[in-house]
């Protein structure tokens, strides 16, 4: 009896021995953690943020589910880069300077739900870069430099629900671009340069409910393309240069509830423009050029019509609109621009009989005169009604391609020596880039009164003659980048009063063409990067009161004079990076109450004085000071900057010390990496402040030797012998109080008094 009993126990004992032998190895694998990371094994989270890592760490615990690598220097994601962490569900690779994702980079991550590749430098995605992500629900590619999408790129993402491609450089959507995305509900394509959508671009998206296409260059409503997404409930098309929408545009979306067409260039709307959108509930037309609107036929469930910011004329012709609004119970929020007796009146507060239909010729003449004083308005563009009328299509110039459906014409790279003529009269986008026109003559674009976007890049243009843009009253985008222009006259730009975006990068400008800008009252965005401008003087920005964005990166600017930016009181973005500024132009920032983003990186600043950003303290949200040779930051340098500041970039400087910045309480990002911090008692206030931040900032000790490589935030042992260490839980010392001696840089002093004396100079 004993023999059989012992033999049955042998198979049970061996597996137990194997498990006992493997247990230490498993425990070690679970407890390992890369030196540059923080591992929370209880929650299976690993964070390696802002550590200047150039490759994915290979000692990450195998059972990790959330891996945060944001803010490193990975540049390339190689094949099978994450094969050692197959349990990942969330992977964050934002701000990693990624330029290439190799084929098969994410193979083995079959459980991944979120992949964040936003804010990198990707120009393309290889065909199989996203293979192996069969469970992925959300893919973030916002803020890259993607120029094209290849069909099949997303074919392996059958579970994806949200795809974010906003803020890239897409100009064209090919057919079947999103093939395989059977469960995508939200597709974000906003803030690109999309002007053409292939007929089958949105095919194969049966679950799509929300499509974001705002802030692109669509100049005609691509109805047939959009209508492929039959399940759309919300469509965002705002801030596109659309001038007209009608039934002939072919928009048919039976489930559409919200349609946003705000901030465009709409001058007319056909009564049946949305006749095939029967469930439309909200229509947003704010900020267009509509002076009148017909009763809309078809969308019987419409309840909200947003019309703010349109020059509505509440004369007799608006009575049908008011009657329809009352009958259909549609709420509207527009206001009358005229006639004078109704100016400013809310449309919703008027009754049809408030709009007079004059019975005598004198009264009618008075109204016509008043409307003329209010300003000429282009006649509304409607559908063609027969041959020989305004929209009759002219022959296309030889060697060019004219597409009637999109109203686009292109002669790109045709070797032309002069601007051709004979384009269709309803052309809205004209692409003449990569030809050779030494000059653009007077009236070079006759009969193109509907033109919205004109591309003249890489044409060797050295001169725009007076009147070159004559007749282009609807032009909004003018691309003159990569030419030989050294100057621009006001006479050259006359005829394009609605021009909003002017691109002059990589020309030969020695100064900002201020006189020319005076001819552009609607200028919104000025691009003058990579020229040879050496200073900004008063008058350089003309009378550009509508100006919001100014890009002057990569010039030779050494001085920004007091008042140089004054006319642009609504300025939101100012890019002065990669210039020769030796000081922050504090005085020149006076009078910019709306400034949100200031780029000063790549200037030889060396030091920041007290109150350097005081004039824009209340509005500024993003401040870039990286790669500026900074060696000293005075205690009050950031005074005035408060809770509004969201990001502060100080990486790649020469900072050995930095005051604490407790007033910056709402920071979402602060980058202090690649600075040689000296971790002695002088740095104690910074250490204390950083320990209270739930952010990875990248600050590491360079000296003394016993602290080298330690994170300033975590190097408690370095500061234990400092005076006041025992009182670390007491109320913190304000940043402006000098808590330690500082060695000032020769010729540089902290103090607002000196700033005040020289604040207008650089």
UniProtKB/Swiss-Prot annotation:
Signal sequence interval, chain numbering: 1-30
GO biological process: negative regulation of chondrocyte differentiation; negative regulation of collagen fibril organization
LRR repeat locations: 87-108, 111-132, 135-156, 159-180, 183-204, 207-228, 231-252, 255-276, 279-300, 426-447, 450-471, 474-495, 498-519, 522-543, 546-566, 570-591, 594-615, 619-640, 644-665
Composition skew (Basic residues), residue ranges: 728-745
GO molecular function, one term: extracellular matrix structural constituent conferring compression resistance
SMART domains named in the record: LRR_BAC, LRR_TYP, LRRCT, LRRNT
Oligomeric form and interacting partners: Associates with collagen and binds to collagen fibrils.
Main function: Potential negative modulator of chondrocyte differentiation. Inhibits collagen fibrillogenesis in vitro. May influence chondrocyte's differentiation by acting on its cellular collagenous microenvironment.
UniProt-recorded name of the protein: Chondroadherin-like protein
Source species of the chain: Homo sapiens (Human)
Gene: CHADL
